[in-house]
Design a protein with these regions (language model features):
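N-terminal [4Fe-4S]-dependent radical SAM core
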Residues: 1-3, 137, 141-183, 556-570, ...
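Radical SAM [4Fe-4S] cluster-binding motif and immediate context
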Residues: 162-316
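Glycine-rich beta-alpha loop elements in corrinoid/cobalamin-binding modules
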Residues: 2, 18, 25, 29, ...
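Proline-aspartate-enriched helix->loop->beta-strand connector
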Residues: 55-59, 222, 350-351
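A short, flexible N-terminal coil/short beta segment enriched in small residues
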Residues: 1-20
């Protein structure tokens, strides 16, 4: 007997915690369970071939918005090849409107609804032991063979989180991939767009068990552990125990990612966070909107000014990589109010500002009230908003331009200095990205692959069309040069940069003995990292200053080179120092 669990991930570096939990919990049937993990970048035919070669006796699929189209095609095609093999599905994408799903997919034997660990174990017993009946298994829906009607069994009782065995014993199978870890399940909040709000029974894994498992990850030096807890810090003592543990057992390599509610953080937690190694943890903070009417309508609990204050306090330690999230397309959010939300959160200058679009998920409050809000969304996954009562499709398209420009020029971290010096030249940050997006659209640059240096050239083209003064363009040329060398020692020198022959003495003096470094002259002192925003552009200096980019000592948060201003060196000094070692 072979029961085959199929996971189709969004990226290779992802792993599917759900299928590993299912196998771990069904411990009496380990030998009969196999897992096949693929990605949406694999051809459907390739996945189909692999499943067929595995020759499963029972085929199961883990279903999410990013893979549902693939799953539906695989179900259809595999059933043609092996109609005798039962096909079961589970996951958030099939746990709602189950009867409709089964009616539309006659190839599917049944659906595992909600939490699947105990249900899957019982299903394994049913097939392996060839005993009992499906209607004795809680948490499933299946088609009655005689009447064709959908049969729903009793729902499963909520899982005790500590009963789920650790699923990463064979950690070598997850090399170069993100480890997903769950220390709690459920959410205390009631956000209308989110499925986590439906599970009101908040449960936590035993803290000593959590510590033991985190110690395993730390010992194995895995690169990243991403907690999937919906609001990690909703219980203060639980969060403190885990943060204290990872701090005390830090191996200098492993990074931990947490999704938190910033306005729940207290001074004790902030003090602990500030004392951590730079890069030890990442924090993802959902804001979604700053429009008070929108926040109330989506049932979100958030004290905005407190959140901003906490975000600034986190940043003051200069040791935490911080993501802030916004959602376009929420009720009562029009183009103008979204632009305001964007500018308010962009002003905080997080390491990344994730701009997403509303997904109308089956089972959510938003799904039930979509008609009331006049939300039009895609019929296919991921059910992304197209327009609402407040936001036209034209507006959505404009915001999508902003999103792409934000990803390329801000979230990439590759144009940090240039974004800072450009912002004062526009009415707002949102306007800057919007106008840049319009420029890309007019020039046909969207949809094309551009090198990093080409992205810089396009920025200069854009600013020339803005009829910027020569002084501004000179400054931008230098800021772009700074940004290009900030990340790496460029193989191709930008065309606008001065010839290296003009400062060869500095290069010979400061970049010796094979040390990975670069020296460059600038006529501007550009803002340091701690300077989040500028009120005016920098003043041009009469004489250049020389900046040394050290690629062997990078910032642990954004991996930019360490940069220091160094003294100008004359040819006589350079000659005098010949043969002597110089630290870079």
């Amino acid at each position: 007997m072979k029961i085959f669990l199929t996971a189709i991930n969004a990226k290779y570096i992802h792993s599917n915690l759900a299928v590993y939990n299912l196998r771990a919990y069904a411990k009496d049937y380990q030998e009969q369970i196999a897992i096949g993990e693929y990605t949406i970048n694999n051809r459907v035919d390739y996945i189909l071939e692999q499943i067929y070669k595995a020759k499963p006796d029972v085929l199961c699929f883990s279903c999410y918005i990013w893979n549902m189209d693939y799953v539906e095609e695989l179900i259809t095609e595999y059933h043609k090849l092996c109609p005798e093999v039962p096909i079961w599905v589970g996951g958030p994408e099939v746990s709602y409107e189950v009867e409709t799903f089964l009616a539309e997919h006659p190839q599917v034997t049944g659906v595992m609804i909600g939490e699947g660990e105990r249900t899957f174990e019982q299903l394994c017993g049913y097939y392996v032991n060839q005993a009992g009946s499906l209607d004795e298994i809680r948490g499933i829906a299946f088609r009655n063979q005689d009447s064709g009607k959908t049969v729903f069994t009793l729902p499963q009782e909520p899982m005790n989180m500590s009963d789920i065995p650790f699923c990463y014993d064979h950690i070598e199978n997850f090399e170069n991939r993100i480890i997903y870890y769950e220390s709690s399940r459920g959410c205390p909040f009631n956000c209308s767009y989110c499925l986590s709000s439906i599970d009101k029974k908040l449960r936590f894994r035993d803290i000593e068990l959590v510590k033991k498992e985190l110690a395993f990850f730390i010992e194995k030096k895995v690169p990243q552990v991403k907690f999937v807890d919906r609001t990690f810090n909703c219980r203060h003592d639980h969060a403190m125990e885990i943060w204290r543990f990872v701090k005390e057992h830090d191996n200098g390599i492993t990074n931990f990612h947490f999704e938190i509610s910033a306005d729940l953080l207290n001074e004790e937690e902030l003090a602990l966070i500030h004392d951590m190694r730079p890069g030890l943890i990442q924090l993802e903070i959902g804001v979604q909107s700053t429009n008070e009417t929108t926040i109330r309508e989506i049932h979100r609990t958030m004290k905005l000014e407190l959140l901003k204050d906490i975000v600034r306090k986190i940043q003051s330690g200069e040791n935490i990589h911080e993501h802030l999230d916004l959602i376009a397309g929420l009720p009562y959010e029009d183009y103008a109010t979204f632009a305001k939300s964007f500018d308010e959160i962009y002003a905080l200058k997080p390491n990344q500002l994730q701009l997403g679009f509303l997904k109308v998920l089956k089972g959510s409050y938003m799904y039930e009230h979509a008609a009331e809000y006049e939300i039009v969304y895609h019929a296919k996954t991921p059910y992304e908003v197209m327009k609402t009562k407040w936001l036209s499709f034209d507006d959505v398209l404009k915001i999508k331009q902003v999103e792409e420009m934000l990803e390329v020029y801000y979230n990439s971290g590759q144009f940090e200095i240039t974004m800072k010096v450009m912002e004062p030249l526009f009415d707002s940050a949102f306007a800057m990205f919007q106008e840049l997006g319009v420029f890309y659209e007019e020039k046909g640059y969207f949809g094309m692959s551009h090198s990093r240096i080409r992205r810089a050239e396009i920025l200069l083209e854009f600013m020339r069309e803005q009829k910027s003064e020569d002084a501004v363009l000179q400054m931008l040329e230098e800021s772009l040069t700074f940004d290009l060398y900030y990340r790496e020692n460029c193989k191709s020198r930008p065309l606008w940069a001065p010839s290296p022959a003009e400062f060869k003495e500095q290069t010979r003096y400061y970049c010796k003995n094979g040390v990975k470094s670069h020296v460059e002259p600038f006529h501007y002192r550009f803002p340091e990292k701690s300077k989040k925003a500028l009120n005016e552009i920098p003043t041009r200096l009469k004489q250049p200053v020389y900046m040394l980019f050290d690629y062997e000592n990078r910032d642990p948060l954004d991996h930019q080179a360490h940069v220091t201003e160094v003294a100008a060196v004359s040819m006589a000094e350079e000659t005098k120092s010949a043969g002597k070692a110089k630290l870079c």
